[in-house]
Amino acid sequence: MPQSKSRKIAILGYRSVGKSSLTIQFVEGQFVDSYDPTIENTFTKLITVNGQEYHLQLVDTAGQDEYSIFPQTYSIDINGYILVYSVTSIKSFEVIKVIHGKLLDMVGKVQIPIMLVGNKKDLHMERVISYEEGKALAESWNAAFLESSAKENQTAVDVFKRIILEAEKIDGAASQGKSSCSVM
């Protein structure tokens, strides 16, 4: 097996959309039912995707809102971003659009690996954002999209595998686009 690659992924979104629950479900395989606002946590996990082992460093950020100022650390050495909203919250869906815009401004690149996640899909009766709305938003960003339920462990692993694939796809395109110049 090839040597493992290190990848750093930031998880961003409005408060109480399930960023920490999704991350803990992926890393530890358990659902934390209580809500304790996150300041910032970092988790690590080894995962194999398409035969390649990855050492993931996951930055679980504090909830942002439309007025949040992004710390510069959110753009340094980050290989991909998971943007999470709750399918039960119009506010979180609107704020994720603002977060995306701020992220593009901060990173300064047109194409960055982004995975849009509609979380809490198990709460059928409270749903206010349709699957189609989430998918359309992701397509407008040229981003990957999944809905998830951290509580029922639906697609948690898929979310993190997919962002790795998105990061590798963009890294591959960037390295193919590089030109070499020789001065003689």
Swiss-Prot record:
Record: residues binding GTP: 16-21, 32-33, 35, 37-38, 63, 119-120, 122, 150
PTM note: Farnesylation is important for efficiently activating mTORC1-mediated signaling.
Pfam families: Ras
Residue positions binding Mg(2+): 20, 38
Chain sites annotated for binding GDP: 16-21, 32-33, 119, 122, 150
Modified residues (Cysteine methyl ester): 181
PROSITE patterns in the cross-refs: RAS
Annotated positions of the Phosphoserine modification: 130
Role summary: Small GTPase that acts as an allosteric activator of the canonical mTORC1 complex, an evolutionarily conserved central nutrient sensor that stimulates anabolic reactions and macromolecule biosynthesis to promote cellular biomass generation and growth.
Misc remark: The conserved catalytic Gln-64 found in other Ras-like GTPases seems not to be involved in GTP hydrolysis in RHEB.
Name this polypeptide is given: GTP-binding protein Rheb
Organism: Mus musculus
